[in-house]
Amino acid sequence: MYPVRNLETWEALGTMSAHYSVKSILHTTATSCLAVVCLVGACSAGIISAQVDVYDLHMRGLMGALASNASDIQVTGQEAHHNSTVVAWVNVDGTQINYPVAQPTSTMADDYYLHHAIDGTPHSLGCPYIDRRSSKDGQHVVVYAHHLASSPLLFGELANRYQQDAFDKLGNATWRSVEDGKVDRTTIFQPLCALRVPASYEAIQRFSFTSIEDMKAWLTELAREASACTENWQTAISGARRVLSLITCTEGNGHSMRRTIVIFVSGDQSEAG
């Protein structure tokens, strides 16, 4: 297990303005915890709406490019962008989640994509990103994104999935791994369980395993602790080879101390391209 000590929360308190700026208060430790991914809900509805509209247009351009050529996502609208930061694309059935995913490089702060769009543009809504200790093709992929109060944008639709009735409405997650600007491999993950946990929750912070059986034992412990599970969770675990965890703040109020974790599993029946 990745060593965790002096556990604290990363706090990113987003205060938006009409100029789309954000003031972030960040408490960091030497060891990463579960990133704070919630935005202040006290902003005016008009400012939040403007933020969402601008972000939505930006993301629609990227999604349109992917739809027009599933193997090349570097062309956005009428402009060409070198989206070398796009390492994957995530889609969750039953939600509006359909986003490119980034991962901080060794020269970036761990929380860089909490306040930067996928192309590196400063933006208070950030973009979904992979935990630095994880990898896009790893056994356990951990992805963070903001929960914006009163909006389904980013991972807002996941915040209440620790409740069984909400969890039951979730569909599969499609994970498209990207290499050199092209979709390299597609993996389908099925929902396994969801938890509401403290920000310093240690159990989810495992990124490698000694064996498949070790991974299954870990998943079993998580499923038993979860407040929402798929009906056939034991069967799902028995066939699991990879895990995808999507994480956001439970409350979109800017100072949430709890995280919602939605865990998906796959037998890793990936398709190239």
What is the meaning of each model-derived region?
Residues 13-19, 36, 71, 224, ...:
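Intrinsic disorder/low-complexity segments
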Residues 20, 24-27, 34, 263:
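Intrinsically disordered, low-complexity serine/threonine-rich segments
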Residues 41-273:
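Solvent-exposed, non-transmembrane regions of membrane-associated and secreted proteins
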